[in-house]
Amino acid sequence: MTLTDKLSHAFTNGTLIDDEFCKEMLRVGNFFVSVSIEGFEEANDGRRGNGHFQKALAAMDLMRSYRIPFGVSICYTSRNYKVVTSDEFLDLLISKGCVFAWYFHYMPVGQNADTSLLLTPEQRTYMKDRVREIRGVTGGKELYCIDFQNDGEFAGGCVAGGRIYCHINAAGDVEPCVFIHYSSANIREKSFQECLQQPLFKLYRKGQPFNENHLRPCPMLENPELLPKMVAESGAHSTDLEAPESAEHLCEKCRAYAACWQPTAESLWQKDHPERV
């Protein structure tokens, strides 16, 4: 197995997408991108730096001119969740040629993560319902939306660790997930097949699904007791490119959230799936 016979998907701020890059995407034929954007100009640039919003839109315009399909990556938080699901914002993306959108629940990754950006149960429930409304056949938008956290039931829970998906960072470290920065394999040193067989990935696949309630899919965010055990057992090290962080430190920031979300998640799951209760 090699990366040349698989679809590869990159998350990017879009600032390096130019004519040459677009031509290269057309040449290889199996590589596509999602441009990160988190709201309109003021809110987006407040998180991603001045000028990013316009550069992101320019990258979309360029890819559209080359007829390259692309998506967006949207991190939703307690502050922007309604804006990034508003008709006005979605219509802007559609007008730029965007065909799909990844919605990612804010994860408190990093030494200085702001846990106030984590959603309340009511806010997360709104996101669950709104994303399904957006992609509805009736009354929806011409934009296919996927909620990485709330759509677990359609994929059998967590998809990471090489079960369906994994992440490769800029240094070549092959990680279970874009939010889980731990690994013991690098694509520059091993084959892709070898990277998929690293101990941490095997533990991921052995443990999946991490919860029978697929509204609680993650071994970090909703089941924070699990990730530190897997990292310790596998011998994986932190691959955070900014500031290494232990799995214990990361998951400690998720414990209050997990406990708060659990009752709502159980209620929603029982309502939607009475046959599984």
What residue ranges belong to the model's regions?
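Structural alpha-beta junctions
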Residues: 6, 68, 98, 135-142, ...
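Flexible, active-site-proximal loop/turn residues at the rims of small-molecule/cofactor binding pockets
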Residues: 16, 39, 107, 181, ...
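Conserved, mostly hydrophobic/aromatic
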Residues: 35, 172, 192
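Short, conserved loop/turn and helix-capping segments at secondary-structure boundaries
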Residues: 50-53, 121, 125, 185-190
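Generic alpha-helical structural signal
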Residues: 57, 87, 125-132, 193
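A C-terminal junction/extension of Radical SAM enzymes
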Residues: 106-176, 217-226
